[in-house]
Amino acid sequence: MAIFQGPHAYVSPGWYENHPAVPTWNYAVVHAHGRARMMDEAELHDLVIRLSDSYEAGREKPWRAAQLPGPFVNAMLQAITGFVIEVERLEGKFKLSQNRPAEVPRVIAALEAAGEAELAALMRNHPPPAKG
């Protein structure tokens, strides 16, 4: 299983208008279940080159791994572990204060004030479903 953690942050009960309340943690996460295998050296090298080329594309002076001495590249690759996972099942979970829909705007504002803009945006874009 591989875990992909999205934005997450502490939520203070002091942010709520309604009490009693306790602290909690809001988060977004995906668990990818499947068979994993380690990449061999050639696969890893190819992947790093393709990723670098992709991110460098369109730059005025794109950096190329070919500019580096082979021994340096090989030493850097030793510090990277590459794996491939054949995904059989994905499990995603969002805990975004859905149990307190009236408090969500206050939590979003407090998260933004605390510098947690990514989580605040996720909550704004995925509001709790309306009751009814």
What are these regions (language model features)?
Residues M1-L47:
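Short, structured beta-strand-loop surface elements
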Residues M38-G132:
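C-terminal edge-of-domain segments
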